[in-house]
Amino acid sequence: MITLVDPNDSRAVRNKDNVLALYDLMIDRKKSEEATARFVGSTYVQHDPLIADGSDALGKYFGQVTRQRAKARVVVHRIIAVGDYVWAHVNFLNLFNDDPNDTGVAGVDIYRMDADGKAIEHWDVLQLVGDPKNSAPWVAPNVPRANPNGMF
């Protein structure tokens, strides 16, 4: 994992640590309600149209996902924290299927954190990973990649 955070910015370090702990507890350890109670503020604003506002809604959404998908997990490839903002480049695996060869969904999550280090706002950009030989598996699965660079 690549981490970009000023070690002298204690707020940014704490916020980065809290986002990593949120992912671990909510998705990898399947304790979403506990995770959101600890790391998400009650006034949480969600910009992903699939999930309602509020920490309870986030906990319920991922609780349902992880109860249905025992293999669900997240791999954090990059994380950047500056002040109240944390950006994470992640790969969500087995959120939507149980395929052991699932390539998952790539995401960039952006969190705004409050003074207590809890997430109070979230944006994301999501993209299917798909076959690494294809350029755009969600639009044109038969178009070959134009470069050898991986998604992560």
Where on the chain are the PLM-derived regions?
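C-terminal and inter-domain tail/linker signature
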Residues: 1-152
